[in-house]
Design a protein with these regions (language model features):
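Short, charged/polar "capping" segments at the starts of alpha-helices
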Residues: 11-17, 50-56, 88, 148-149, ...
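Active-site donor-nucleotide binding/catalytic segment of nucleotide-sugar enzymes
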Residues: 129-184
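Catalytic donor nucleotide-activated moiety binding site of glycosyltransferases and closely related
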Residues: 5-10, 163-203
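A short helix->loop->beta-strand "cap" motif at the edges of active sites that frequently abuts
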Residues: 73-78
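A donor-sugar binding/catalytic signature common to diverse glycosyltransferases
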Residues: 44, 203-220
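N-terminal pre-catalytic "stem/leader" segment of glycosyltransferase-like enzymes
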Residues: 1-50, 146-147, 173
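Well-ordered, non-membrane alpha-helical segments in soluble/globular domains
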Residues: 15-21, 56-68, 154-165
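A nucleotide-sugar donor-handling region in carbohydrate enzymes
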Residues: 81-153
Length: 220
């Protein structure tokens, strides 16, 4: 079986080293070219989009390398290494990663975690708090409007639809906390809903919004 690890699927040396170490352990091939090379199993690092929405990303070859690999490796196993979701910090040198078969997102990837033991989760040291039954407001948590997890959805439309849906079921105050990457892009939209007790929050940290929230709503 030929297993190719595509080093140029990421520009970050630390992540390339993960691919190199992985390849060494399983007897794989480290591919240094910008494009796809025929194999039985392909291994890449990071998510992909056919056309990055951020202009500066259009200049980065690794985005096009991954699209080329995905399109030419159809109907064969693709292993995708991506950033972690739990306990994630702002760094490129993560201690843990998610590894998906054929994709990187829940619902599309097979993470081979059905009936898996809890040892890896326990190593993260996360504590699950009891289900909250009290709280003052409903917190809507924003997402980076260019994030791959949105799969091209108009996030402004999702916010408007979500607010309208919530208002049919609750009269609690609604607080919208946006993703910091968006700056103030959503503020004008949220301000148009001020009449129905919807507010935009950008002060302090998200912890203050979570503290007294009755529940949270998020797209991903």
């Amino acid at each position: 079986m030929k297993i190719n690890f595509f080093l140029k699927s990421t520009p970050i040396n630390y992540q390339r080293q993960i691919l190199i170490d992985f390849a060494d352990k399983v007897g794989g091939n480290c591919i240094k070219s910008d494009g796809y090379e025929e194999c039985d199993v392909a291994v890449i690092f990071g998510s992909w989009k056919k056309t990055p929405k951020k202009k500066w990303k259009l200049m980065l070859q690794h985005h096009f390398t991954k699209v080329n690999i995905v399109e030419n490796h159809r109907d064969k196993p693709l292993i995708v290494i991506e950033t972690p979701l739990l306990g994630r910090t702002i760094t490129d040198n993560h201690e843990y990663h998610r590894v998906g078969l054929n994709h990187f997102m829940r619902g599309l990837a097979d993470f081979k975690n059905e009936n898996s033991p809890s040892d890896r989760f326990e190593k993260l040291g996360l504590k699950i708090k009891p289900w909250r039954k009290k709280g003052d407001h409903v917190l809507i948590v924003g997402q980076n409007m260019n994030d791959a997890s949105l799969f091209g959805i108009d996030f402004s439309w999702w916010i408007k639809n979500t607010i309208q849906h919530l208002r049919r079921h609750t009269d609690r105050p609604i607080v919208f906390r946006d993703h910091p990457e968006n700056k103030d892009l959503m503020k004008n939209l949220i301000d148009t809903y001020e009449w129905c007790n919807v507010s935009y929050s950008n002060e302090g940290t998200i912890n203050s919004d979570l503290k007294n929230a009755h529940c949270t709503v998020a797209y991903t």
